[in-house]
């Protein structure tokens, strides 16, 4: 597969011919320009209100080692946007930092008998040097690390504000547990029943854990996606919508009859189909829910206990699988259907989840496949209450769930489903046994982690006072410096629990003995607000400067991988909405526009050590230069598509860059020369390139901009060479070379800066300003008409855009190439599509 994108004029090839390119030295440029940029503070925003502001942000990296090919692609994309907006005259904030808390650092510390900070900050230094070499146009004065106490002080401060609003709370619940890492996982961190990070099968464990009440914001998180539509990828919005999972239906109250010494109990279920209540033939509670133990009779208790042990070993994916045979245990109890008074046997089963809905369901096997599978396994009744025109589910084994009219449903008989649902809800509400309700798949965010290298939770547990937040003036609660190596090994409880001098403190309220909370926060908490801190990272009176925050927020362009669609992006939206509700910011969405870059593959597969198909970024940079690697990443495909490194050619990019750089060497006219006196054809190409590039950049079609740039370089070289090399004196050549330098600076900043310098301009080309174009020069004097004989191209004619069909036909027939192809044959027909095509069919 070629890396050369199709343009309007065909495939743009990387130019390799031309003058001697040996004097082009990427190593010399990479050594020269970074210090100049730093001294001039080229990438530091003025931030004085004199220019319109734009905020461009790449998802900040985790310091797991040096930069890799994925970083090279993602950060090149964001850098193009930032550099383009600067050229357009905006004051651009493009900061950089590190998401530096996390489990890999802790595991590295255990392996090396060190403190996690040593590994973390050594890697940060390595990555920072690589980012600078890679010419990322970041404002380094705003650099931050989430593991710095001056950062996580404000993470803790925000946690307290959430706590005060009832949005941070603790509860006992079954949680996802990774046996290898000995820590809990949020639902979003479990993939196909396994730990997202290490791949170990996840089990369930009951723990007292901290949660953020993200469900309070479910409606807004869903509804506000409308304002992101058209600016975020549709697949990201679809993934978030499905994860939030809003379902409209009803809460229905069932009475569980008393049995033996077990009293009667009211249990509420959520259903999207209250119209099918007459079809309920049994009742199911989640086997792992406390309710199951509460309901079971003594006769069935032992069977339930054994079954619950089996369920503990199953992942959520396995429990909800449609392929597994259904299992369950009868509890010995019966639920009363509120509409018809029928008694339904109550079962405990694994296919119902304790933390979804209410942890209990009314089972309607005729119209739900999982219920039907369960009913067939345990020989329970199946009663159809919706006539869809299909065969009886009790016979076919296939539940029906389409449109239809109600049957076997008392007063609901004969109603279509759309009318039966609100009618059933009205009946329930009138008799006080149910109500309309909206349910969400989204569950509250589990944020506790039993690990060391994270933000400590700023809560003190006092025997007398209960939970006591650490006073603001005592923040940050810092991590103890003396824990390292084996002290951090997974033990099922947080390593912080072993730091007795750290744990045992005085209660801020009663001054009695108390203990710190020993869990740390999920690292996604740190990354849910970092974009706000970048606005004023040195501010000491709050998480950000209230006088500055609304000048920059929301982020205008956010760049990162689609793998963060549910986790980071959803959490960041939640945090932003809460902080907005606290009255701290005007924006209630963090990112106005989102660009998801594709993956970098090798041989059609993701790069990995196990496959042995990794490509070392450092080696590529050393061999071809930063600019060639950046340009290859951009040119290889549209930003959102994958790049297969096996199919691309950094060497071709390097040759093109040398050819572009040579243009500046060959310009002999003085700066400021009147381009209007130069070659009009070249000027037309230059101005069309400027106009087209701007339009393409505005729509993130970066690869096509590079193709247009290649065409301009070729046209400029052609003009220079047309006068036996003396064409460099043509002021139109200078104009073209300067345009090349400015546009190229977005993709290949070292080469462009060197060109700008050779052309007689002071540094930096990054602030040169986007070149203007003359509309009159966008009108082409000629267009290329393709002449085909029997479907094969035989000639190309430069003609007026206004040429008529008759004139174009005559020119085509008069062509020597066409006459040679006809070889004396007559003509059956001539098809003319002026001004671009003539197709001649011989007799």
Swiss-Prot record:
Which InterPro entries did the record assign?
Answer: aa-tRNA-synth_I_CS, aa-tRNA-synth_Ia, Leu-tRNA-ligase, Leu_tRNA-synth_edit, M/V/L/I-tRNA-synth_anticd-bd, Methionyl/Leucyl_tRNA_Synth, Rossmann-like_a/b/a_fold, tRNAsynth_Ia_anticodon-bd
Q: Which family does it belong to?
A: Belongs to the class-I aminoacyl-tRNA synthetase family.
Residues bound to ATP are: 609
Tell me which UniProt keywords the record has, alphabetically: Aminoacyl-tRNA synthetase, ATP-binding, Cytoplasm, Ligase, Nucleotide-binding, Protein biosynthesis
Q: Which NCBIfam families did the record assign?
A: leuS_bact (TIGR00396)
Query: Where does this one sit in the cell?
Result: Cytoplasm
A cellular component term, taken from the record's GO annotations: cytosol
Any GO BP: leucyl-tRNA aminoacylation
Q: Which CDD domains match?
A: LeuRS_core (cd00812)
Its EC top class is ligase
Q: Which gene encodes it?
A: leuS
Whether Acetylation counts among this entry's keywords is: no
Q: What Enzyme Commission number(s) appear in the record?
A: 6.1.1.4
Pfam family of the protein (one): tRNA-synt_1_2
Where the record places motif 'KMSKS' region is 606-610
UniProt KW Methyltransferase keyword: no
Q: Where is this motif: 'HIGH' region?
A: 61-71
HAMAP family recorded: Leu_tRNA_synth_B
**Swiss-Prot/TrEMBL catalytic activity:** tRNA(Leu) + L-leucine + ATP = L-leucyl-tRNA(Leu) + AMP + diphosphate
**This protein's name:** Leucine--tRNA ligase
GO: which molecular function terms? aminoacyl-tRNA deacylase activity; ATP binding; leucine-tRNA ligase activity
Classification of source organism: Bacteria, Bacillati, Actinomycetota, Actinomycetes, Micrococcales
Broad class of the protein's primary localization: cytoplasm
């Amino acid at each position: 597969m070629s890396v050369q994108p199709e343009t309007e004029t065909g495939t743009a090839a990387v130019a390799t011919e031309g003058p001697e390119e040996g004097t082009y030295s990427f190593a010399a440029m990479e050594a020269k320009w970074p210090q100049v940029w730093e001294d001039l503070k080229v990438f530091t925003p003025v931030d004085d209100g004199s220019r319109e502001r734009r905020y461009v942000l790449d998802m900040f990296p985790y310091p797991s080692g040096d930069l890799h090919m994925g970083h090279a692609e993602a950060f090149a994309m964001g850098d193009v946007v930032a550099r383009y907006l600067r050229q357009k005259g905006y004051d651009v904030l493009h900061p950089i930092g590190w998401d530096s808390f996390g489990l890999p650092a802790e595991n590295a510390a255990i392996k090396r008998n060190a403190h996690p900070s040593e590994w973390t900050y050594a890697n940060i230094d390595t990555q920072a040097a690589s980012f600078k070499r890679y010419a990322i146009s970041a404002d380094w004065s705003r650099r931050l690390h989430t593991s710095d106490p001056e950062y996580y002080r404000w993470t803790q401060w925000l946690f307290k504000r959430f706590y005060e609003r009832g949005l941070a709370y603790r509860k006992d619940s079954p949680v996802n547990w990774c046996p290898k890492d000995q820590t809990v996982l949020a639902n979003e961190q479990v993939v196909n029943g396994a730990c997202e990070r290490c791949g170990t099968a996840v089990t369930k464990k009951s723990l007292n854990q901290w949660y953020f009440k993200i469900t309070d914001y479910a409606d807004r998180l869903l509804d506000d996606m409308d304002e992101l539509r058209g600016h975020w990828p549709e697949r990201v919005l679809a993934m978030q919508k499905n994860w939030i999972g809003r379902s409209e239906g009803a809460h229905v109250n069932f009475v569980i009859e008393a049995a033996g010494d077990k009293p009667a109990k009211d249990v509420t279920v959520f259903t999207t189909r209250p119209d099918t209540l007459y079809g309920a033939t049994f009742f199911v509670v989640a086997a792992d829910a406390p309710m199951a133990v509460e309901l079971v009779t003594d006769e069935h208790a032992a069977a339930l206990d054994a079954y619950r042990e089996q369920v503990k070993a199953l992942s959520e994916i396995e429990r909800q699988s449609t392929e597994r045979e259904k299992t369950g245990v009868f509890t010995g109890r019966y639920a009363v259907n509120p509409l018809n008074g029928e008694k339904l046997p109550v079962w405990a089963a694994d296919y119902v989840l304790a933390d979804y809905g209410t942890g209990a369901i009314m089972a309607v096997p005729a119209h739900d496949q999982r219920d039907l599978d369960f009913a067939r396994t345990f020989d329970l009744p199946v009663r159809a209450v919706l006539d869809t025109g299909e065969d009886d589910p009790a016979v076919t084994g296939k539940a029906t769930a389409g449109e239809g009219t109600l049957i076997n449903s008392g007063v609901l008989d004969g109603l279509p489903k759309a009318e039966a649902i609100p009618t059933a809800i009205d009946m329930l509400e009138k008799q006080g046994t149910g109500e309309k309700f909206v349910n969400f798949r989204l569950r509250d965010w589990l944020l506790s982690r039993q690990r060391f290298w994270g933000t400590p939770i700023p809560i003190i547990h006092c025997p007398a006072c209960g939970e006591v937040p650490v006073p603001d003036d005592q923040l940050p609660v810092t991590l103890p410096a003396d824990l390292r190596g084996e002290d951090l090994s997974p033990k099922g409880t947080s390593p912080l629990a072993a730091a007795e001098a750290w744990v045992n403190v005085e209660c801020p309220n009663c001054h009695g003995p108390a203990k710190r909370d020993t869990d740390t926060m999920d690292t996604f908490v740190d990354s849910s607000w970092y974009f706000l801190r970048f606005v004023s990272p040195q501010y000491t009176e709050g998480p950000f400067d209230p006088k500055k925050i609304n000048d920059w927020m929301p982020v205008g362009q956010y760049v990162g991988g689609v793998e963060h669609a549910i986790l980071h992006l959803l959490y960041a939206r939640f945090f932003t909405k809460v902080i907005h509700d606290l009255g701290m910011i005007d924006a209630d969405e963090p990112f106005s526009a989102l660009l998801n870059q594709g993956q970098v593959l090798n041989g059609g597969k993701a790069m990995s050590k196990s496959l042995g198909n990794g490509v070392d970024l450092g080696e590529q940079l050393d061999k071809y230069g930063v600019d060639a690697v950046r340009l290859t990443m951009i040119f290889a495909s549209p930003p959102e598509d994958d790049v297969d490194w096996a199919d691309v050619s950094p060497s071709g990019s390097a040759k093109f860059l040398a050819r572009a750089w040579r243009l500046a060497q060959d310009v002999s006219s003085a700066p400021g020369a009147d381009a209007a006196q130069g070659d009009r054809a070249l000027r037309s190409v230059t101005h069309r390139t400027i106009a087209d590039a701007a339009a393409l950049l505005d729509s993130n079609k970066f690869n096509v901009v590079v193709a247009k740039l290649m065409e301009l370089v070729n046209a400029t070289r052609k003009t220079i060479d047309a006068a036996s090399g003396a064409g460099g004196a043509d002021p139109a050549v200078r104009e073209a070379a300067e345009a090349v330098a400015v546009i190229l600076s977005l993709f290949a900043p070292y080469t462009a800066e060197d060109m700008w310098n050779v052309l007689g301009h002071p540094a930096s080309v990054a602030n040169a300003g986007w070149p203007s174009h003359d509309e009159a020069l966008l009108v082409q004097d000629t267009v290329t008409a393709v002449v085909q004989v029997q479907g094969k191209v035989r000639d190309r004619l430069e003609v007026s855009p206004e040429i008529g069909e008759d004139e174009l036909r005559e020119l085509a027939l008069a062509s020597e190439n066409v006459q040679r192809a006809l070889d004396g044959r007559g003509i059956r027909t001539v098809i003319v599509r002026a001004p671009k095509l003539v197709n001649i069919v011989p007799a």
